[in-house]
Swiss-Prot record:
Disulfide bonds: none annotated. This is HLA class I histocompatibility antigen protein P5. Expressed in lymphoid tissues; Detected in spleen as well as in B-cell lines, NK cell lines and activated lymphocytes. It comes from Homo sapiens. The level of circulating virus in the plasma of HIV patients (viral set point) varies among individuals during the nonsymptomatic phase preceding the progression to AIDS. This polymorphism explains 9.6% of the total variation in set point and is associated with the HLA-B*5701 allele, which has the strongest described protective impact on HIV disease progression. However, it is possible that HPC5 polymorphism, and not HLA-B*5701 allele, plays a direct role in the control in viremia in HIV patients. Coiled coil: none annotated.
Length: 132
């Protein structure tokens, strides 16, 4: 899945960052959402609705291991914070307060995702992501 999303740092909207989400499998129904992703000085809250249900809805999805590949598009001053490799994690749907700080994601079987980027509860911009 290829996503374009907004960066948010120190309450200022930054440049767009391309992120590639490569899941080992897709399973489950309904929506999924992430915890805030905090790497270096960046804080990003990413919520995706995979064509069914609403973000934060009652439907729970199974665990989905995946890789969040952080690209080299970030400026060089933050490259060491973001890294050039990947983060592999698993996260279960539900109340985000009960899950770890570093974001994991729940996926469902939809070819198109509506991507909402927000930080500190403030909506920033919608984008589209499609399965690769």
């Amino acid at each position: 899945m290829l996503l374009r999303m907004s960066e948010h740092r120190n309450e200022a909207l930054g440049n767009y960052l391309e992120m590639r989400l490569k899941s080992s499998f897709l399973r489950g129904l309904g929506s999924w959402k992430s915890n805030p992703l905090r790497l270096g000085g960046w804080t990003i809250l990413l919520t995706l609705t995979m064509g069914q249900g609403e973000p934060g809805g009652p439907q729970g999805d199974p665990w989905v291991p995946h890789e969040l590949l952080l690209p080299s598009l970030c400026d060089s001053s933050h490259a060491s914070s973001w890294g050039s490799g990947s983060i592999t994690c698993a996260w279960r749907g539900g109340d985000s307060s009960s899950h770890p700080l570093v974001s994991g994601h729940i996926l469902s079987n939809s070819p198109v995702a509506a991507v909402m980027c927000s930080s500190m509860g403030t909506h920033l911009s919608p984008f589209k992501g499609t399965l690769l």
